[in-house]
């Protein structure tokens, strides 16, 4: 996998209350990923970018919410979420604090 595709696969870390609990208790991190990304691509991208060992990847397709923009009804875009489980002793530090 080339460097350009690695950067396209992982969009951003997904920060939520559930994601924080998963990271603390299960050593599982949540990412927003490209809709066409496979589990193998996600695994390789995380291992290359963060230099960690990935044990498992689970994905979920999230449907965009219906919203009103003024009086006009609209819909947010659909997106894909990946739960990445790391090997024991591995960690990802998003903040870079030491």
From Swiss-Prot:
InterPro entries reported for this sequence: Nucleotide-bd_a/b_plait_sf, Ribosomal_uL23-like, Ribosomal_uL23/eL15/eS24_sf
One Gene Ontology cellular component annotation held by this UniProt entry: ribosome
Any Pfam family: Ribosomal_L23
Keyword field contains NADP: no
UniProt family annotation: Belongs to the universal ribosomal protein uL23 family.
Assembly behavior: Part of the 50S ribosomal subunit. Contacts protein L29, and trigger factor when it is bound to the ribosome.
Function: One of the early assembly proteins it binds 23S rRNA. One of the proteins that surrounds the polypeptide exit tunnel on the outside of the ribosome. Forms the main docking site for trigger factor binding to the ribosome.
Name this polypeptide is given: Large ribosomal subunit protein uL23
Species this protein is from: Alcanivorax borkumensis (strain ATCC 700651 / DSM 11573 / NCIMB 13689 / SK2)
Gene: rplW
